[in-house]
């Protein structure tokens, strides 16, 4: 077996490889690069599940970064159990082919209770006093303590949120190096999210000095991994899930459904409104540039479809035939799936008056919000000194007081300059595959995301 390293570099596209990415540029020159024909929605959980299983969303069930759990009548995003994902995974196929095959899965999603030999994933601690304490989950248990002892606490707050930066990717890179050195897995999978942050904050402005710095930083992380892989005699594959393209503002799909009388809310927390998904006739789970629209009354699907199609910023709305064409015909999908125009994205906002927005709307809270919220990448522009404000709230928490980290805007959706999820129009702005083995990446056309699993196995077993 040929030991192999797969580096998932979020948001990396052919257009981003150049003078600021010398290590990746060298890998392309010595090996090969092909576009990746990704799936829809082109979002983290969906694409990673396709890369790992070789199946479309209709086969593995990760129809977005979350979905409406119909039996619970609740929306849940960013679940972590690998048992939610159907299909045979890369590492299971490898072990079936050779029982000596091993796999380390470092920070890919759905990474708890996985059948991979070694794994690690973000997993904060939530004490009853309301704090969120950075931590990670690792299998086996001793790996957790090894990584903490070697690298310190996982930097959760730089993994996502308004202060997200290179330190989380650097920690993941070093944890991967440790596992490669100490466990010698046949296949090592790692995930570097750094480009995701400023590409959404700033858009893919290749002349922006901050983005050029980001490219140099992520290339340095990749360089350390590639150097270690070459030292260990590993093949190297670099892959991305999606490309991030320019956007101007959000489409407030749930507000339109609310105004049409299709969404029900319940007043809680001193009059603040909470989405009552189970009692709503129709609501949308917004996830970047797609939205799953769940319609409880089949007789009203046509009415809801027409309403959404008429909204400014909506490109198309998939019904059953449309979902089948996109590989989204799965029971977890909404009755309808909306896709935005290239320069727009969907917000989850369902309230019509900011005074009654839920308290979590002003915080980084990926689990309570019934949809993805890229505005979490920004401090509220209305706060004069946001870092001081956040520090004061954090100090109160450390003193044992409950304090709401309400430092995120709930209305400045125009802050977001980059998004993803819909099919990318220009392959140069879309995801890619790079391989150190050009003979395994021959041809000029795109690599189908559903073919990536076999491509990895070919690297290991050819």
Give a label for each model feature.
Residues 121-149, 210-220, 255-274:
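Acidic, His- and aromatic-enriched active-site or binding-groove loops in soluble protein domains
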Residues 5-9, 29-35, 43-49, 66-79, ...:
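Glycine-/proline-rich flexible loop or hinge segments
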Residues 19, 37, 42-43, 67-83, ...:
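Secreted, luminal/periplasmic, and some membrane-associated catalytic domains
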Residues 415-435:
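Short glycine/proline-rich, acidic loop/turn segments that cap or connect secondary-structure elements
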Residues 15-59, 104:
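Short, structured active-site-proximal loop/turn typified by the sulfatase FGly-forming signature C/S-X-P-X-R
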Residues 11-14, 41-42, 57, 108-113, ...:
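Short, solvent-exposed loop/turn segments at secondary-structure junctions
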Residues 2-14, 27, 51, 94, ...:
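Beta-strand elements within well-structured catalytic alpha/beta cores of enzymes
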Residues 55-205, 280-285, 289-296, 300-303, ...:
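His/Asp/Glu-rich, glycine-adjacent segments
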């Amino acid at each position: 077996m040929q030991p192999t390293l797969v580096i998932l570099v979020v948001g990396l596209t052919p257009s981003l490889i150049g003078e600021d990415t010398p290590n990746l540029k060298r890998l392309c020159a010595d090996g090969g690069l092909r576009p990746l024909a990704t799936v829809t929605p082109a979002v983290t959980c969906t694409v990673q599940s396709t890369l790992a299983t070789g199946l479309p969303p209709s086969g593995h069930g990760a129809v977005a970064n979350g979905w409406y759990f119909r039996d619970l009548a609740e929306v849940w995003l960013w679940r972590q159990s690998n048992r939610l994902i159907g299909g045979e995974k890369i590492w299971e196929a490898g072990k079936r082919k050779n029982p000596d095959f091993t796999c380390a899965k470092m920070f890919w999603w759905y990474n708890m209770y996985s059948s991979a030999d070694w794994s690690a994933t973000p997993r904060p601690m939530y004490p009853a006093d309301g704090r969120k304490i950075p931590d990670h989950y690792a299998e086996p248990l001793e790996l957790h303590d090894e990584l903490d002892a070697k690298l310190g606490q996982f930097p959760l707050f730089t993994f996502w949120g308004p202060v997200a930066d290179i330190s989380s990717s650097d920690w993941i890179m070093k944890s991967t190096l440790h596992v490669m050195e100490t466990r010698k897995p046949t296949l090592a999978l790692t995930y570097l999210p750094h480009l995701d942050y400023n590409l959404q904050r700033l858009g893919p402005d290749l002349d922006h000095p901050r983005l050029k710095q980001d490219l140099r930083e992520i290339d340095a992380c990749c360089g350390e991994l590639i150097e270690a892989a070459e030292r260990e005699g590993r093949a190297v594959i670099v892959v991305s899930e999606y490309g991030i393209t320019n956007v101007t503002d959000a489409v407030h799909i749930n507000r339109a459904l609310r105004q049409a009388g299709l969404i029900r809310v319940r007043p809680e927390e001193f009059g603040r409104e909470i989405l009552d998904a189970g009692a709503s006739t129709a609501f949308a789970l917004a996830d970047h540039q797609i939205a799953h629209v769940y319609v409880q009354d089949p007789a009203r699907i046509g009415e809801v479809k027409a309403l959404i199609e008429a909204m400014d910023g909506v490109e198309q709305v998939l019904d059953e035939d449309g979902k089948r064409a996109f590989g989204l015909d799965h029971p977890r999908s909404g009755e309808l799936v909306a896709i935005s125009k290239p320069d727009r994205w969907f917000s989850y906002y369902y309230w019509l008056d900011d005074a009654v927005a839920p308290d979590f709307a002003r915080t980084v809270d990926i689990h309570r919000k019934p949809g993805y919220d890229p505005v979490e990448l920004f401090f509220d522009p209305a706060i004069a000194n946001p870092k001081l404000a956040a520090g004061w709230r954090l100090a109160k928490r450390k003193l044992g007081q409950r304090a709401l980290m309400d430092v995120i805007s709930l209305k400045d959706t125009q802050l977001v300059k980059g998004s993803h999820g819909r099919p990318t129009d220009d392959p140069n702005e879309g995801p890619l595959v790079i391989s150190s083995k050009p003979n395994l990446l021959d041809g000029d056309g795109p690599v189908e995301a559903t073919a990536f699993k076999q491509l990895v196995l070919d690297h290991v077993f050819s």
